[in-house]
Swiss-Prot record:
Its main location: cytoplasm. This is Ribosome maturation factor RimP. GO terms for biological process: ribosomal small subunit biogenesis. PANTHER family: RIBOSOME MATURATION FACTOR RIMP. It is found in: Cytoplasm.
């Protein structure tokens, strides 16, 4: 078992006690710097990071392999990677990049196959001059999404 596999196993075991928290990123550098990125259905509390950090640190032997450890919540501007993240962000505005376009819109639905985005657009009137505001919706399969990021509005 590699060092990274061992760390991943320890994280998986620790997360069994915290079903609302899930692993987004795990990186282990050549110099054995462990970086863990977590997310949660209701966010990630500092105590969650501490608990996961302790679960890793207490089960690895620094005599066998010295390492540094960083456990954190993924940032608001981090790309969404799991379907579970899309589902938790329904109702929020996303910037979604696909192969053909970049869309900024509200996420109104997320299931196991695709998401549905909704936004308002100005289009030429069907009759007469000028433009009118119309509501648009687009269904995008996860397989077509290159990147999706939640936008922060103040």
């Amino acid at each position: 078992m590699t060092f990274k596999e061992k760390v991943n196993e320890l994280i998986t075991e620790a997360l069994l006690e915290k079903p609302s928290i899930f692993l987004i990123d795990l990186a282990v550098s050549d110099s054995f710097k462990i970086s863990v990125g977590l997310d949660g259905d209701n966010g990630v509390a500092l105590q969650d990071c501490i608990d996961i950090s302790r679960a890793i640190e207490n089960n690895l032997d620094r005599e066998e392999q010295d390492f540094s450890l960083e456990v954190a919540s993924v940032g608001v501007g981090s790309p969404l990677k799991l379907i579970r993240q899309y589902k938790k962000n329904i109702g929020r505005t996303l910037i979604v990049t696909t192969n053909n376009e970049k869309i900024e819109a509200e996420l109104i639905e997320a299931n196991d196959v695709f998401i549905i985005l909704s936004w308002k657009a100005r289009e030429p009137k069907k009759v007469g001059k000028g433009k009118e505001t119309v509501q648009k919706e687009q269904q995008i399969p996860y397989t077509e999404i290159k990147e999706a990021v939640v936008t922060v509005t103040f």
